[in-house]
Amino acid sequence: MTPEHLPTEQYEAQLAEKVVRLQSMMAPFSDLVPEVFRSPVSHYRMRAEFRIWHDGDDLYHIIFDQQTKSRIRVDSFPAASELINQLMTAMIAGVRNNPVLRHKLFQIDYLTTLSNQAVVSLLYHKKLDDEWRQEAEALRDALRAQNLNVHLIGRATKTKIELDQDYIDERLPVAGKEMIYRQVENSFTQPNAAMNIQMLEWALDVTKGSKGDLLELYCGNGNFSLALARNFDRVLATEIAKPSVAAAQYNIAANHIDNVQIIRMAAEEFTQAMNGVREFNRLQGIDLKSYQCETIFVDPPRSGLDGETEKMVQAYPRILYISCNPETLCKNLETLSQTHKVERLALFDQFPYTHHMECGVLLTAK
């Protein structure tokens, strides 16, 4: 695979290899055959970041080869959304011959939605001033004249200039209902939107008919907790990043959901609060004991669950675990399988043509 060529003819083979690999990894814990969810074979990534290389009068996107660290010029990127590909061409054309926008520009980040909105961030090794803003506004207006629904942001050390806004609103059809998700620049969002829809629908399917409330750790912008709210009496969710919490609160209102409560705290802190080890001012007005959480949802970082959180989740009858790293999932399962058994197993091909796998398991108490 090269940045400008996807081996789409190998899609089925690479997916089959992942299924075999996941089954092998999960063998100590389950003999289930994974439910497999395919990605689009191209244009599946909704965000991308590129370094910018200055070559005399020329200017272009590059990425670095992971093995050799050599530069690779990238003029098109079929893994990314069609909108990102349009913007890559338009941004280079708009910046190449503009000294103010070009000088000391070292990176461009793209974030797009299925609803065809985009935020493009230009990163600089220089101070950004009013002259930069004027030129950036002219570029933005020129892009919009090409029917590109784009917002531009300038970033430099301790500086962030938003010409309009630093977010876009995604609209996803999830099990017969449109979900609105505000996505903030420089915050985590699911990179493969088509795959995200399938993950949300799978999570809804495995939790249908649920009793009681749902607890979610690491909720981000509310991606899962808001979609799953229809299956539970109430949802209590934690997140540490301020922009994500703000986006989650917006998403609750935008989707007219009234049974989700977001708390800004780390999973480790929440564990302490639930166990009565510490009291937190930010929990004032929230009666944790009133929640009857029979299901806990976790979507941890690549490092998986820490030991304390492992112990905490074992107290719940059902654990729904989405993993972006099956190796750490299996490490966690060494502990979790002492009290729970795997009921459902899914493979989500979030990152086609790479060794990365995303998977989901539903665990129920033995």
UniProtKB/Swiss-Prot annotation:
Residues bound to S-adenosyl-L-methionine: Q190, Y218, N223, E239, D299
SUPFAM superfamilies linked to this entry: S-adenosyl-L-methionine-dependent methyltransferases
Domain of life: Bacteria
GO biological process, alphabetically ordered: tRNA methylation
Reactions listed under catalytic activity: uridine(54) in tRNA + S-adenosyl-L-methionine = 5-methyluridine(54) in tRNA + S-adenosyl-L-homocysteine + H(+); uridine(341) in tmRNA + S-adenosyl-L-methionine = 5-methyluridine(341) in tmRNA + S-adenosyl-L-homocysteine + H(+)
Catalytic residues in the record: C324, E358
CDD domains named among the record's database cross-references: AdoMet_MTases
Family: Belongs to the class I-like SAM-binding methyltransferase superfamily. RNA M5U methyltransferase family. TrmA subfamily.
Protein name: tRNA/tmRNA (uracil-C(5))-methyltransferase
Phylogenetic lineage: Bacteria, Pseudomonadati, Pseudomonadota, Gammaproteobacteria, Enterobacterales
Name of encoding gene: trmA
